[in-house]
Amino acid sequence: MPTAKRTSSRASLALPFQLRLVHKKSWGHRLRDFISGFLKSCRPIAKYVFPNFIVVHYIYLITLSIIGSILLYPCKNTAFIDVLFLAAGASTQGGLATKSTNDFNLYQQIVVYVITLLSTPILIHGFLAFVRLYWFERYFDNIRDISKQNFKLRRTMTLQQRELSGSSGNAARSRSFKDNLFRGKFVSREDPRQSASDVPMDSPDTSALSSISPLNVSSSKEESSDTQSSPPNFSSKRQPSDVDPRDIYKSIMMLQKQQEKSNANSTDSFSSETNGPAFIVQERHERRAPHCSLKRHSVLPSSQELNKLAQTKSFQKLLGLRRDEGDHDYFDGAPHKYMVTKKKKISRTQSCNIPTYTASPSPKTSGQVVENHRNLAKSAPSSFVDEEMSFSPQESLNLQFQAHPPKPKRREGDIGHPFTRTMSTNYLSWQPTFGRNSVFIGLTKQQKEELGGVEYRALRLLCCILMVYYIGFNILAFVTIVPWACTRHHYSEIIRRNGVSPTWWGFFTAMSAFSNLGLSLTADSMVSFDTAPYPLIFMMFFIIIGNTGFPIMLRFIIWIMFKTSRDLSQFKESLGFLLDHPRRCFTLLFPSGPTWWLFTTLVVLNATDWILFIILDFNSAVVRQVAKGYRALMGLFQSVCTRTAGFNVVDLSKLHPSIQVSYMLMMYVSVLPLAISIRRTNVYEEQSLGLYDSGQDDENITHEDDIKETDHDGESEERDTVSTKSKPKKQSPKSFVGAHLRRQLSFDLWYLFLGLFIICICEGRKIEDVNKPDFNVFAILFEVVSAYGTVGLSLGYPNTNTSLSAQFTVLSKLVIIAMLIRGRNRGLPYTLDRAIMLPSDKLEQIDRLQDMKAKGKLLAKVGEDPMTTYVKKRSHKLKKIATKFWGKH
């Protein structure tokens, strides 16, 4: 009985506590717990059924097509193969139809409407962003709270630095470092032995260097290199608490300046050290450094003193003011580590010579030397013997500042570090170091956690932007078109004659334009509206921003939001990260350079089709009855629809044959600009291409069909030949694009011709029938390419308003359905893409591999897009040739 009482009392005491715990969980947390439990139970099967995003995408589209056909078939107003064909076209935005859409009833049209909205690229990739956001919250504990605390800390320290500098923003850079340093309110005390005017802190003191005199050190026996020796005893060395921060700061400046002077006169060997800087490379030969020694009474703090003094307030103020001045020669590459490892061989009678040392980043490094870099630390004099001395702005000195000062004004002629890039805003408390495509190099555990928090907040904001974008532009589309369809009586009558309400026609057409479906509720598509500029112009806009122009519009919106957001806000931090590193968060958001290239490509392709239409069909019989202004608009509308949407404003079968060939080619390349942009901005681009070479530079891997650059001036041909033999050719950005194109062609061509071959077998009798001249191989190829490009254009068949596919047999229609599903997956990223991979141990391993790869290789400069660099280089060479040619004439 007493035992029962004790049990009940314990239960009664524990119950309120358990209820409080359950009460604290939000509905979102409970939903995530339910999803997590369900996924854990399905994990043994799911990892085989859904191994990656590509397979999930295939399964989703096929499932949606089957579900759509099941929902459409109960009306039984058409054969099941035609219903399946329509559902597959809706789920892939193919736009081909074996039966006019207006012949289906309202229920079936609504089903097509919903299926299309659930399968657009924006929705699928946006849903993937939501999944990654959910996984971030499940995989990282308290990531939301930690990232918020880091943001508050960065903002507080930034405001404090602005207050210390006496100004805000860029005005802090106008005050010199020396004037700021020796003000009483910044420095707690002055060095009694030296005045402020004697030693400017932005340059090393030459008198201090001249005061160095020999320090004789002898040993009774030669010490082994693997035994750690104690540093020499300085008679006047002060305790760490007695050393003025200015002394240690000047020591660092002297060390760095002497390193720079040694760069021009010596070539040092670099050993294999994984902790070295990512941009230092290994030389083949070792040289002894010049003999020098330190004065016995000179003061040079040890590394332990550096660690302690670097954390003091006064030293951090000094360094903060130094950074405010804008000189980032020494402290802007925080993640870089300058490791000096001494290889000592000192005899008994030798004086303390500067030992040979090594400094290298990785076990295997390239033999190339970084050019045009002023701060390459190759040598560092030292007075210590048999001791490993390291200088690391982040780890050795613990200089992990929690705020960035205002951005320094770049001095004229100053060449930026090829691995560093100025951040859009202070979303990190340290200056990151990059490789190709936003690869962060040399991160500590604390930095990775901070970066993960910033990426999480950026992804969370991006999800909100995507949701508003998708819903908002769909609403804007039908708000734009529905009132016009209801108020223009002439066109309202045309719509009603097709058995459709003008209001519903406006809703469906707006969705079809923004989703690039290409179906219309009028039997002749948009031919009846060839003289209505209002819907044609707005539909072109929604067609572009709903598909290939989506990354351009999305980045433009984020840029506008960034420019108008409040300074030092969490909102602006996230926007800045999205602008700087978009492909770490989303597959359809690109950096500035690739975005401009995508924009240029779209303009060129559309302009090419438009110009060809004007040249070849402007005065043809099919458009002659329309005014010239409307003809130009029809040509522009058709050129825009040819690549993605599939609407037609003119009968394509009556156009010039060369225009038909041009349209077929444009349908095939429709997805290539977007697909290549996705793949060449992939964070793991090299690994996705299979470039795992670690013994040489990433840029030295070439393909056989790359164009070899030649010297058109005829100079140094023999030298170029020798250099080509001695070292590998340099990998150009064009080579990566070529690799992506070759992969895409190998993915496409065999499938296209296999489908064409099967259809020609099934439709052989119709092709041979002389009474059906419009049923020919070219028309079938046009249909196959249209399906594979998920465009929806068709040459049609005489006296019908449907696609040519309506004349196919059941097997041929199944082949077209397979083309639609396969073609819809053309523009997906590679399996190895950070933007589609969920946070996991596997992702951490890939990041670690990428970091090790980057540390040992000289990656491309990140300040400029590689394709832009390539084009500039080629244009400069062409300009040089043209100048020489015209100079002779």
UniProtKB/Swiss-Prot annotation:
GO cellular component: cell periphery; plasma membrane
Molecular function GO labels: high-affinity potassium ion transmembrane transporter activity; potassium ion transmembrane transporter activity
Location of the region described as Disordered in the Swiss-Prot/TrEMBL record: 189-244, 705-733
Known glycosylation sites: N216, N233, N265
Transmembrane segments: 52-73, 81-101, 110-130, 465-487, 500-521, 525-545, 549-569, 585-605, 610-630, 658-678, 744-764, 777-797
Compartment(s): Membrane
Composition bias, Low complexity: 207-219
Top-level taxon in the UniProt lineage: Eukaryota
Cytoplasmic domain ranges by topology: 1-51, 102-109, 488-499, 546-548, 606-609, 679-743, 798-889
Function, in words: This protein is required for low-affinity potassium transport.
Family recorded in the similarity comment: Belongs to the TrkH potassium transport family.
The protein, known as: Low-affinity potassium transport protein
Lineage of producing organism: Eukaryota, Fungi, Dikarya, Ascomycota, Saccharomycotina
